[in-house]
Swiss-Prot record:
PROSITE patterns: DAGK_PROKAR. It comes from Haemophilus influenzae (strain ATCC 51907 / DSM 11121 / KW20 / Rd). One of its GO terms (biological process) is phosphatidic acid biosynthetic process. It is an enzyme of class 2 (transferase). Its main location: membrane. This is Diacylglycerol kinase. The keyword Metal-binding applies. Its cofactor is Mg(2+). Gene3D superfamilies: 1.10.287.3610. CDD domains: DAGK_IM (cd14264). Pfam families: DAGK_prokar. One of its GO terms (cellular component) is plasma membrane. The keyword Magnesium applies. Its EC number is 2.7.1.107.
Length: 118
């Protein structure tokens, strides 16, 4: 298989990333919800954050949730591709992916709560 380099590699990588975002938005309800919330929360950071670092932390915490949701969706897709029958390892993989999103949501709560209330 021919491996691209340079500008061609960058263009192809960007194309594949955009395809992944489009696929997640089309197929994953949770990702659509998180995109909707990000469209509200990210602009709010410029009004609620008092310093540049607060704004950066608030935006980064929201984007972290979205990134982990993409990884969680990828894990679920691969597990479902392997087979739809119940298996302990498949369940653990899906649960752990979900737990990573939950922890990211806790981080959002800590960051936003810490900035807004302390």
């Amino acid at each position: 298989m021919y491996k691209t380099t340079g500008l061609t590699h960058l263009i192809n990588s960007t194309k594949y990333s955009l395809q992944g975002l489009k696929s997640a938005f089309k197929n994953e309800t949770a990702f659509r919800h998180e995109c909707f919330l990000a469209c509200i929360l990210i602009p709010l950071t410029f009004f609620l954050g008092e310093t540049k670092i607060e704004i950066i932390l608030m935006i980064s915490s929201v984007l972290l949730v979205m990134a982990l949701e993409l990884l969680n969706s990828a894990v679920e897709t691969v597990v479902d591709r392997i087979g739809t029958e119940r298996h302990e390892l498949s369940g653990r993989a899906k649960d752990q992916g979900s737990a990573s999103v939950f922890i990211a949501l806790c981080i959002v709560g800590i960051v936003w709560g810490g900035i807004l209330f302390f």
